[in-house]
């Protein structure tokens, strides 16, 4: 270790407690698993440690209320959920079964019961749930432009406008061509320096909090690491994408409060059963919707100012020359600067603001979640924690992470991707068919496949894919080493298996190596454009936790 720990974290199976609940007391979580990881530190020899994942739900509904709601839902299902899709299995259940845990947990149970492709009907809505890499590949890569984002676009459009995630296909194609070149190697090399400086500040802040609490003579200290990692991710997005210092690691500004308010509203909309915010007067009558509009106004005002300032100092240049800049020494190495300076791209301010808002929302949650879960998993596996510490000490010594050194930190990188395998962010990818299609039957499904009409909503369950017993050995175990070896189930017809040599030079395992059994950032043309940014950011932050000894 580089420095002696200020406070020791001791976590064992005996004193480790986990509780998983949905993010809302009344609705299932469909897009993400918001979580809160709490450590209790003690400065005495007897240490008490507990981890709590997510907030605790309120009181359970009375059974009679559940029955009334279920009966109404079942009636709507029978009347409005549409015809059967040939021989496709149908999963039907009580809608209130989803209230006490995230939706994707139930989707996993039904996957084991009904197979890799099944129809799920609840109330007036029906979905096709996919838990098979062959079918996922068919939708995401082979027929990528026969599907759009569907329900997801409906939810996110009021927040992200025409940003990359909710954008229609034509807008997406135009913006992807512009944004993708911005994540070039020189930019990522400079970002590693930024990741390091921001992460070091966060870890030092955590240690100072522990040291300060210890001086007060408290027997235990509760520290919300998820909140600290969220602040870290927000600061990195601000500086790396906008060239704007949110100051989120050290203080809380009105912009930060507005950002978190918007994040909470995005989560709320993704989990609420009835889209009441679409009602004409909701934005003025409903208090949380009024607050949401106020938060959007604060963020948009901030982004408009950043765009205006960037355009005032615009230096128009070809893409090739932009990528050749010395980003390590630029005063402004942000992605916004790259987009504004790109020759021949006269995008209007509104579209640019939508792009930035999308990066702010999407780029913030993944990093905070993966770091929190990584700490959780390492706490349960002290042998792997020691192995990671040994690698950091060997590769870095007294030095700091660099782009080149990241290539040597193999085990740390594998910890990040194994965390994303077990706890993907998001656990579901949502698509809607734009025309009729025939889905492959998938493993143990109908060999003739399943015909679906235009307008069919599809849930690709990343959680199910990542924990499928058909494609992973010991799928529920935390084994970063699994990504180093080939894995091929010959019983699965049409799946090429897991082969690290399939994508030579890749720093991190991806959908190509796994033939779509591993999809933490999606796959195909509409795969997340900032995946390498997020993966490197998480890797560097985890390394800094070891370098500055946030735990033993």
From Swiss-Prot:
PROSITE patterns: CYTOCHROME_P450
Entry's Gene Ontology cellular component terms: chloroplast membrane
Subcellular locations according to the entry: Plastid, Chloroplast membrane
EC number(s) stated in the UniProt entry for this protein: 1.14.-.-
Required cofactor(s): heme
Family matches, as CDD domains: CYP97
A molecular-function term among this protein's GO annotations: monooxygenase activity
Transit peptide start and end: 1-52
UniProt keyword annotations, A-Z: Chloroplast, Heme, Iron, Membrane, Metal-binding, Monooxygenase, Oxidoreductase, Plastid, Transit peptide
Top EC class for this record: oxidoreductase
Residues the record lists as binding heme: 528
Family as reported in the entry's similarity comment: Belongs to the cytochrome P450 family.
PANTHER family listed in its UniProt record: CYTOCHROME P450 97B3, CHLOROPLASTIC, CYTOCHROME P450 FAMILY 4
Protein name listed in UniProt: Cytochrome P450 97B1, chloroplastic
Organism encoding this protein: Pisum sativum (Garden pea)
């Amino acid at each position: 270790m580089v420095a002696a720990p200020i406070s020791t974290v001791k976590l064992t199976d005996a004193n480790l407690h986990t509780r998983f609940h949905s993010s809302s007391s009344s609705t299932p979580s469909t897009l993400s698993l918001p979580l809160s990881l709490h450590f209790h530190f003690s400065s005495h020899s007897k240490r008490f440690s507990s981890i709590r994942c997510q907030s605790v739900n309120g009181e359970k509904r009375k059974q009679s209320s559940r029955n009334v709601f279920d009966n109404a839902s079942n009636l709507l299902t029978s009347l409005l959920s549409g015809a059967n899709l040939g021989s496709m299995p149908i999963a039907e259940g009580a809608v209130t079964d989803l209230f006490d845990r995230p939706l994707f947990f139930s989707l996993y149970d039904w996957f084991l019961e009904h197979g890799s492709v099944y129809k799920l009907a609840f109330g007036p809505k029906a979905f096709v749930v996919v838990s098979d890499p062959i079918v996922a590949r068919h939708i995401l890569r082979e027929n990528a432009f026969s599907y759009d984002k569907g329900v997801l676009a409906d939810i996110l459009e009021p927040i992200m406008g025409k940003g990359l995630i909710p954008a229609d296909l034509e807008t997406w194609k135009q913006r992807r061509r512009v944004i993708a070149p911005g994540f070039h190697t020189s930019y990522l090399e400079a970002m590693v320096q930024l990741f390091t400086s921001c992460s070091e500040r966060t870890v030092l802040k955590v240690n100072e909090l522990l040291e300060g609490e210890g001086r007060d003579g408290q027997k235990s200290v509760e520290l919300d690491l998820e909140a600290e990692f969220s602040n870290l991710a927000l600061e990195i997005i601000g500086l790396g994408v906008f060239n704007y210092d949110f100051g989120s690691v050290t203080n809380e500004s009105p912009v930060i409060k507005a950002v978190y308010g918007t994040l909470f509203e995005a989560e709320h909309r993704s989990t609420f059963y009835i889209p009441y915010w679409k009602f004409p007067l909701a934005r003025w009558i409903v208090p949380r919707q009024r607050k949401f509009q106020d938060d959007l106004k604060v963020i948009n005002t901030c982004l408009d100012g950043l765009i205006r300032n960037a355009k005032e100092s615009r230096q128009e240049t070809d893409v090739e020359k932009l990528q050749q800049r010395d980003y390590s020494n630029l005063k402004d190495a942000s992605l916004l600067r790259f987009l504004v300076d790109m020759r021949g791209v006269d995008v209007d301010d509104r579209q640019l603001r939508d792009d930035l808002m999308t990066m702010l929302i999407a780029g913030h949650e993944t990093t905070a979640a993966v770091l929190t879960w990584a700490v959780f998993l390492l706490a349960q596996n002290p042998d792997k924690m020691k192995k990671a510490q040994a690698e950091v000490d060997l590769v870095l010594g007294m030095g700091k992470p660099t782009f080149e050194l990241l290539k040597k930190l193999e085990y740390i990188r594998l910890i990040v991707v194994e965390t994303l395998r077990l706890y993907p962010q998001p656990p579901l990818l949502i698509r809607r068919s734009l025309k009729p299609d025939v889905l492959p039957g998938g493993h143990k499904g109908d060999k003739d496949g399943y015909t679906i009409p235009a307008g069919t909503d599809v849930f690709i369950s990343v959680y199910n894919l990542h924990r499928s017993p058909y494609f992973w050995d010991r799928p529920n175990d935390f084994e970063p080493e699994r990504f180093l070896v080939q894995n091929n189930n010959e019983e699965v017809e049409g799946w090429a298996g897991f082969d690290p040599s399939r994508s030579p030079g890749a720093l991190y395992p991806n959908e190509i190596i796994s033939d779509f059994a591993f999809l933490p950032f999606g796959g195909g043309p509409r795969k997340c454009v900032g995946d390498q940014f997020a993966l490197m950011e998480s890797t560097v932050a985890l390394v800094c936790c070891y370098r500055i000894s946030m735990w033993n």
